[in-house]
Structures are given as C-alpha cells and as structure tokens.
Amino acid sequence: MSIQRTLSIIKPDAVAKNVIGQIVARFEQAGLKVIAARLQQLSRADAERFYAVHKERPFFKDLVDFMVSGPVFVQVLEGENAIQVNRDLMGATDPKKAAPGTIRADFADSIDANAVHGSDAPETAAVEVAFFFPEINIHSR
C-alpha cells in the first residue's frame, strides 16, 4: 500500500445542488484526507488547458462550456491508494451505469453533468494537482 495524492473536482452541477459537504464526507469516511481545497470559477482558458487531452474529441466544447458554467470545488485528497479509492467512490462516468451508493449514482444527472472529476493514474494526478495547487499550498496532515 502507498500513500498517494489525487485531484478531485466537484463539478458545477454538484456545487449548484449544495452537496459539497456530503461528497467531502464520503472521501473522509473512506480514509482520505483533504489537504488542499478551494472554491473557484474556472476561466475558459483554464478549462481548455486542464482538459487539453480531450481537445480533439467531439465532446470537448461541451465539456469546457459545462466546466465554466458555475463554480467548482477543487481539492487534493491524500491517503492509502487515494487514486483508486476516489475512483471507486465516484463510480462509473455515466451515472446510469454507476453502482448504487457511489457519488455519481447519488448526485449526478447525466454523463456530462456527472458531479465529480478524479485523476485516473499517478502521473495524471501529479500533473492535475500541480495545475491547481502549488506545493506550498498543500498541507499533509
């Protein structure tokens, strides 16, 4: 087992539903610690840079439009196997296919408005965490 860090974004749809606390509680109950967090409005340029890996995909414009439609809650989670634990808590990308009790099954409306984003691998986690949080703003506890 290894201590990992992962990026979690509570997306505009879940922020608008006022379920930030319920989602964070699930992370903490699963043994993950929030070691950096903030509520912010993404600029279009930031959303395009963050999701640049999807730039050539047909859904890119809709994804960027959605991510700038309201504030997001970005956080760094730390814990044993944090990346996989977070992905298990989130559930399948499509909430209709997400297991009961997962964040997306409980709080997401569609494959587009799917409540949360989480890093998918250690390499992407490192890049995504650094995108939002300089190391000086991250505090292990």
From Swiss-Prot:
It is found in: Cytoplasm. Pfam families: NDK. Its main location: cytoplasm. The active site is at H117 (pros-phosphohistidine intermediate). It is an enzyme of class 2 (transferase). InterPro entries: NDK-like_dom, NDK-like_dom_sf, Nucleoside_diP_kinase, Nucleoside_diP_kinase_AS. ATP binds at K11, F59, R87, T93, R104, N114. Transmembrane segments: none annotated. The keyword Electron transport does not apply. It catalyses: a 2'-deoxyribonucleoside 5'-diphosphate + ATP = a 2'-deoxyribonucleoside 5'-triphosphate + ADP; a ribonucleoside 5'-diphosphate + ATP = a ribonucleoside 5'-triphosphate + ADP. SMART domains: NDK (SM00562). GO terms for biological process: CTP biosynthetic process; GTP biosynthetic process; UTP biosynthetic process. GO terms for cellular component: cytoplasm. Its EC number is 2.7.4.6. Its cofactor is Mg(2+). The keyword Protease does not apply. Keywords: ATP-binding, Cytoplasm, Kinase, Magnesium, Metal-binding, Nucleotide metabolism, Nucleotide-binding, Phosphoprotein, Transferase. It comes from the Bacteria. GO terms for molecular function: ATP binding; metal ion binding; nucleoside diphosphate kinase activity. Belongs to the NDK family. NCBIfam families: PRK00668.1. Major role in the synthesis of nucleoside triphosphates other than ATP. The ATP gamma phosphate is transferred to the NDP beta phosphate via a ping-pong mechanism, using a phosphorylated active-site intermediate. Homotetramer. This is Nucleoside diphosphate kinase.
